[in-house]
Amino acid sequence: MGKAQRTKGAAGEREICELIFQNLGIQVHRNLSQTRDGGADIKLNPYSIEVKRRAAIGNIYEWMDQASNGCDPGERPIVVCRADRKEWLA
């Protein structure tokens, strides 16, 4: 993964953190060790959130598998994705 892709992904994760705060009043943070240790991009108990920010929406089933694999016991996976110049989908 190139630097531009990592930057775009991190920006998407920050957008979702901000949207969660604006809509739910809950402060959440990115999982900065996700690349090294695996796991979800964002944890919001009982949810494990995988964020995808891409030029176009890809294989959502693969993303859901990734989100499921990043869950701790008792958590529910959520995939949040956005294609360029489109709205977020969950």
Predicted ranges, named:
Residues M1-A90:
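Catalytic phosphate/metal-binding cores of nucleic-acid and nucleotide-processing enzymes, i.e., regions
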